[in-house]
Structures are given as structure tokens and as C-alpha cells.
Amino acid sequence: MATQTDKQTIGRHLEQVPKASNLISWSRNGFIAYIPPIITTTTTTPTTTTTTNNNKSNLLLTYIKNSDGKKWQLASPEPINIKLENNFLPQLSLVSWGSLNTDLAVSDIYGNFYILLAGVGLLDPNHIPSTITTTSTIKTEGNTEKNKDTKQIGNGSGTNGHGDSPINTPSFELTSYNHMEMIYRDIINPDINVAVNPGASIVAFKWLNIEKPQIVNKAATRLAENPTTTSSNSSSSIYGYGINQYQPYGVCHPIPTKQACVALRKNGQFILFYQGEHKVEYHKICCNLTDNISIIEKASIGFNNDKQIIVTAWDSLSNDINVYSIDINWGFLVESAKRQKLDQHYHTPKEAQKPPRLTLKKLHQMKPIQCFKEEDGESQSQSVVPEMGKLKVEELSSIDIISSNPDPKSGLSILITYGSSIIYRYALEKSDSSNTTSGGETSKNPISQAFYNLGVEKKIDWKGDDSSVRLVFKDKLMRRGQIESIINGFLDLSSLIIYKDGTVDVVDTTSKQIVNNSKNNNSVTGDEMELDNNDYPPKLISNLFDQGFQFPKISHKNRLVLAISPTMSSIVYTEIYGETVNLQLKPLERIDNFGTNSHDLYYTSVAFAHRYAFALYTSTCSDDLLLLIQSEINRIKDAVDGDTITRNKLGKQLCDSVIIECHKAINFHLDTITKESLDKLLSNNASLQKLLSLQLILGEFQQSSHFPNNYVVPDIAWIVLNLRSASLGIMFTLSSIYRQVSKKKPSEDTLQDSITRGECIMSIIGNFKWLIDLLVYLNQELLQLIYVKNNFLNNGNTTTSKLTLSNSIVLPLILNKVSRLFLMYAISAMGRTHEILKKLHKDLTEANKLFAPMKESLNRYFSISNNSPITVNLFESYLRECDALLNKEVPQKILTANNSINGNVNGNSGTSTNKPYSALKFEQKLLIKGIDVNDDNDSSTKISNTIIEELSNMILDRYSISISRETKLSELMFYDTDWLNIGINKKEVPSYTIDALRKLIISDSSTSTSLAKGEKLRVCTRCRAVSLVGDVTGLWTMVFQRTCMCGNAWVNV
């Protein structure tokens, strides 16, 4: 009976959660945490009806994954269970990802609060997170300040509530984001046999902002309508891109790498949970909004421009809506933040650790207004006297705060909703004696006007409080739909109104305009939020809605649990009392601007590029955006009349345009890359990484039997990504070895030194093998292309060779500047490492200190190096010759092409400064499209093909002179490079599993089921690369502990 009662209690409390948006949270890392809906089974007998709760987990985690290169889907949900004593799974009521996307806040119906940390593993599984709290508050009401004694509550471990001491401090290791550990618990009600205490439940929650600048891209702006200035998009309008850099705003933890959050319980207790100056543990301080007994039914938390926390709460006992401001004095953390900018390991002495404090002030109090609505759903103005029988009184349904955003002109808005459809918007404004309210009170005078006038007659001048703030009514918004919840968007630049029928309005918080749903039935009544969508192409493209996309319609029977992706490209949803715990995933749908000509494709690509740039600047996962791009490509193919080849060409045209616009949107110019800037691309530049991963996925999606050469595009992206990671690994390892040998003489080497250095060398063995085999494959292609060329010149006929100019990989890799520089850099790094290891081997042998670990690792390295069928130094010299040749020839040929075009247009070749063709277009053609002589969509592509063909013949002739005569043809052509899985002989399903990071075969099965005991795999959610979990501290693979080479997240499997 007790169990059945508890299940009924759980179901009732889940239904009573005021906002279904509290039950799901989508992080910018791409992980979706959600509280599963109640899955019930009803059993009926002649005498009773029994309902059974079938939930086995109370918290689930999922993410979007690339299943086969062409399809995206949600992964099977993984249980992240929150347990109380005796392994009891309480019903959860709140889940929210933090601002840094690694901390997950969770609360249950008993009021217990938990924080989980994603991407870490607990080294001591038996460690239980403790709760250490400090309470310190100053309450201020009006001009009276009441100080309370500081009270410290704790378990004796730590000082001033801070667990920076080694006592009871857990140790973590970094791992994939789908692995989580609980790092904090605030247990209010551990006894599950006690009835739920309604006063302990959390009714409002918010994460604090991060104390660091944020870059966000501006809206794409239409620049011109001049055909002579257009790019390869063949459009008469081109768009320009820019960025905004916002300074930290709102309320932030003073240390940029730390987080804090605030919560309000139903009994009026306000709590600040915050991290200390080091480590990940949380602490808390709290205060009560009032000394009286209160039951807060509806509340919201936000931040204003003065770095204050604003709380608006409705007390059901007094029927008052109260507004409070809360200031945080961060204590010693402010000074620590300054010191850590100079010394990141700075620790504040314990005697100087003054804990944070809260200062509370009541700003305003009012009663809910009487709000009326016509029975048929039409709104009624508050000034109109209601007619009984036609109007009904709407009750207070929700309170929401839209925080001020980084724009200094923005302000905090308090939204009070009645009847789930009528929104009254208020703002907090400082007092001004010149402004009077409709009730006859001045903003600066809280007493009635009559008493104020009496004071003037008595010559008593009351000047008021210059710092006083009043709640000012701004406007009323009428909605035809029933509002489920209102949530803040990224950086509070927008807010989302989610309706009970599943539709969503996106509201710009600065202009107060709805940027989507211009034709939706839920549109605002009146003209408060009108948006002109008749301008096409639009002057500004700031989101996908500007190009005719809209959130999909959802058919459902029960209450929806819905979340919108951070890129606003798709939604996920489920139903309470649904048939499954799995979420449903839907991308945006196109409802307008269905054109498929080259202009329309370009405008669409601008919208996609703007969103992709937003994801890159804000470190947001964009997998859902790729899903939308692929669905749009499929829509275009289905909408066009014609054969399959025509449809696929149109899809490829959009694909290429999206990639090119993404380069432009983040201001990444392939033609400006130099040898000097290559180090930045290797170490800390995510732009190239993200652009290549986009090219990899879209290129893989475009592969079909109608375009057999389409493998070239993803292969080029994959090779350059691997060249980047391999070069980074080699240089990192080379630096580590150099530091080790510079500290000690070879005669002082120990066994531990040998083990450490041996591990460094072994970590790059696979990448050495991959690089050498890649060079071998490139030489194989070059030899075949020379054969094809000579056969055509000598015999005048075509060859039966599968390899041609169009499907070659080696030619675009050498002709393109970026890939050529990466090749040269990787070969140079190999050469330097080879020389150091040769010297090290010699010195250790002479000193009789060549221990077994070093001996084994060096033998494996030299075995790979010595068995190569090519001479690496010779090929490096060839690449340098090609580099010098291309740096000279490419500008000359581009100049000739432009002169030729200008001569054709103007009648002479020297009078125009018009440059329709550029080095950028040439480099983009090679890296993004490869060499496709059949690609002739526009004049720019035809010029590229002509130049590429001429330059290809040059580098093939140079290869014939420099290398081919000194190459052992039989050894080279029969050398096995199939495991690289690139080029014309690529296997769709390899017969083994390769660690993509370390370039080692880890399983003789493509299903990865025959791993060694104790080994675990991680998989990339985007490119599907696999790698072994576990990175030795100090090795280069630590750089990729959480993210793949393509920049997306790993997930442990």
C-alpha cells in the first residue's frame, strides 16, 4: 500500500510541476538531460483498478548522433540515476545545465538539491559528496537595516564552509561528457517514509552568468545588388558578416572558470550555491525573503543591469506579489579572481577567507490584478467595465523574469501572466520626482499625494530615497494560445514562449518583436509585435526564421515536455504519461521561400552559415543544424523536376554554397594562410577544425552512385583533420622528449625515465605509420596519373584507369595552400623527430642506459621508418619545389584570367579594375570541391578548372623529373595502404576497427566487440571515429580527452 501511495504521489507531483520546461535541459555541448515521463500500466480486476509506475530511471541523458553518415538520430537514453538512502529513486522536478555546460543542477519533489559534473570520472568510487553550508545575510527593508549574526553550519571538514582543504576532497579524471559524477548534495528530506514537505520544494532556479567576454555574430547584412561584385553564389545580392564582443553582464561568479546558481524554495528561503576558488565543490549560503510564514507558489529569478539578483514571488497566503533585490558580496573570491589572472594557482590564506554574504532588499509589493477575458477567448481591456456573463476572471498563472542582456540599453522585464494567455510586462525603474503614477503618487514619493502636499504646506520637504526603485507597468500582451512556459534564450538576447499545443514564439528581448510565427494563430493581438516579412531577400538574416523556417507542428494527447536546441534548429519532445521514455527529434520545417534557383539556394546558405558561425563563436554543438541542412537538401531534391543527376547536382550546389558561406561567415580566408600562421591553426584555432568537420559530414552525405567522385570532398577534409592532429601529437611529443633529455645526461637515465619516454614514443607510433602510408598512397596516385597522362599524349586515347584528374586526392592536396602546408609541416616534424630519436638511441647505447621500454619503442619506430618504400626527404624536397612553383604561378594565372574577362567585357584588357576571379575562389575550389572537371556551374568554376588542369600538368611533370626515376615501382605500387580507407579503393565497411586518434588497429572486427579485457571505447557523435578511453597524463592524447579530432564530443560506449 505504501509503495502504491508513493507512486500516486510521484505522478501527482510531476503533473503539478508549474513549467514542463523544468523537466528537460539541452546543453550547448549537445547533451540533453531530462526527467522521463511517467510510464504507467493499468491493471483492472472485477473489484480493483491498479496503476503501476514502470519507470526504472529518474534521470536520462541523450544526444544527437550520426548513425551512418547520412542519418542523424537521438541516441538511446542513458540512465543517470539520482538516489537517496536505500537506493531510492525520488521523483525529480528540476533539471538545468549550467553556463559552462558541464554542471547539471537537479532537484526532486522533496526539495533535495544535487549538482552533477559531466566529463569527469571519480577516481575513488566510494566517495560521497558532502554538504558544507554557511549562512550569512543582511536584510534591508526600506531605510532600515537589520543585521543578523553570522551562523555557520557544517560537518567539521573545511574552513568557513570551503572545502579547499585536502580533507574529504574527491579526485577526478577527465573523460567524455556522457559520464557524470555527483559533486554536491543538499539533502533536505532524506527519509522517504515521511510525507513530502511542500515548503522545501524549489519553485525558482537560475544559473549565474560567466565572468568573461562573449563573442556573438551579428546579423548577416545585405550589402549590394551588383552582378559585378558577386561571389560564386551567382546571386545579385551578397551578404556581409560581423561580430559583437559582449562584456560580462548580469550577476557572475567573480572567477571566470567557476559557477554559481541561485534557488528559491516554496517556504521563501533563497539560496546561493557557489564554487570556491579552486576545485569543483560547491558551498551554499541562504536567507529568507521574509520573517513571516509564506507559501511561494509562483516565482522567477533574473538579473538587472546593476549586477543585482531580482526575485519576483507570489505568496499565496498573503496574496501578495513581492519584488526583491539581492546583492552578493563575494568576499575573498573577488581578490582571488584578481590574483588568479597573474597566478592561476593562487590560494587565499585561510585567515583571509572572508565568506560571501547576501544583502536582501524589498523593492515592491502589490496584489494580483483583476484580469478579465471573454468566454470565446477574445481579450478585454482592463479599462472596460466587464459585463457579467460574458467575461470571466483569469487567475495568476505564472511569473517570469527576462533578464537584461549585454546591450547596455536593455532592461529587465517582469512578466506576470494571467489565464495562461494575458501577459502584463513590468520594468524596474529608479525613482524620478517628475514622473507620477496613475494613482497620483510620484515615483520618488511613496506616501500619498495628500500627505506630500501637507508636508509642503508645513514647509517640510521630503526628498525621498535617491536609490529607491519602483515597479512600472509597460504594456499588456494578449496571446490566443495557452502558455506553458517562458524561458530565456542564450545571453538573454531572446526569450521563448512555449505553448501547451507545442508551438513556440521567439521574442527579441530588445525590440520586443516576435521573430517567427508571423502567420501563426498564436500571434499577438494588436500591433505590439508586428514583423515585416515581405522584404525578400531580407536586409538582415539573423536566424533561420528569416528564410522561411519554422518550428514543426507536434501532435500529442498529453502534456508536452519540450526543449529547443541552443542553435534553434530543432526540437525534442515527449509526453507526460507517454508510451515511451524516448524523446522525439524534429528539425525546423520550411513554410516559406521554397525557391530552388541559384539565388534562393544562396540565401538559404547564408542563413545556415550564420547559424553555424553562431555555434562556432559560442562553442555550441551544431549537429542539429547539420540535420536541418541535410533535410533541406533532401527537400530541394524532391521539389525539383528532372532526373536523378539533376536533383543531385542541385543538392551538391547547396552543399558547396553552405560550406563556402561558412568560411566567409567566420572570416576564414584560405588564401591568407602562411607558414607563419600555421602554428596557430595547429594549436588553438577551432575555425578550420569546425569547417573541415562540416565539409566531412556534408561531403559524406552527398556520396551516391550518380556521383562516384564525391568521396574526394570528405576524404580531403578527413586527411587535413588527421594531418593536423598527427602533427600536433608529434610536436607535443617531440617537445616532451626534448625537455626530458635536456634535464639529464644519458648516463643519468633511470628505468622510470625510460618508461616515461617510451610511453611518449609509443603514443605517436600509429601516427608515424599513418603519415608514412599516406605519403606512400599520394606517390601511388602521382605515378598512376603520370601513366594516364603519358598514355593519352603518346597514344591519343583515353585510359581504362579508375584514377583520373577529377577523382584524384593528391592533386588538390598539393595544389591547395592549406593542405600543402600541413603536409610539409608534418613531414618536417617527422624529420626532426627522426633525428632526435637517432641521437637519443646512440647516446643511450653508448652510456649503456638503453633499458627495455626505450629499446622496444625505438625498435618499433625505426622498423616503420626503415620499411617505407619511399624516401621521405626526397618527397619533402618535391613538395617544397611545388610550393615555390605554385606561389609564383597561381597569382600570374589569376591575373591573366581576370585580364581576359575584363577584355571580353570592356573591349580591352587593361582599363578595368574588376576582379571577378580571385585566389580565394581558387583555394576554395580545391579544398571544398576537389578537382571536378565536369563542375561548370558558373564562369568562376570554369576558370578554376582551366587553371587547375594547367598546374596539375606542371606538378606531374616536376614529379617525373624529381622522383619517379628513383622510385622502386614494384615496392611502391604493391605496398598496402588499404587501411587508410581513402581514395578510389575505399571500403565502405572496413574489416577492422582503428583508433582514429592513435592510428592503431584495436579490434579485428568492425563492430568493436573483440576488445582486450578492461578496454573501453569512445565514439565521436559527428564523424563516428572511435578511440580507446584512457589517456595517460602527460601524453599528447590528453588534448583530445573530451573532443574528437573533428571538434565534436566523444561519448563513452
From Swiss-Prot:
Q: List the disulfide bonds.
A: none
Q: Where is the composition biased (Basic and acidic residues)?
A: 142-151
Q: Give yes or no: UniProt keyword Transcription.
A: yes
Q: Which residue ranges are recorded for the region named Disordered? A: 139-170
UniProtKB keywords: Activator, Nucleus, Transcription, Transcription regulation
GO biological process annotations for this chain's record?
Answer: positive regulation of DNA-templated transcription
Q: Which GO terms describe its cellular component?
A: mediator complex
InterPro entries for the chain: Mediator_Med16, Mediator_Med16_C, Mediator_Med16_N
What's the subunit arrangement here? Answer: Component of the Mediator complex.
Functional description taken from the UniProt entry: Component of the Mediator complex, a coactivator involved in the regulated transcription of nearly all RNA polymerase II-dependent genes. Mediator functions as a bridge to convey information from gene-specific regulatory proteins to the basal RNA polymerase II transcription machinery. Mediator is recruited to promoters by direct interactions with regulatory proteins and serves as a scaffold for the assembly of a functional preinitiation complex with RNA polymerase II and the general transcription factors.
UniProt name for this protein: Mediator of RNA polymerase II transcription subunit 16
Name the gene behind this protein.
SIN4
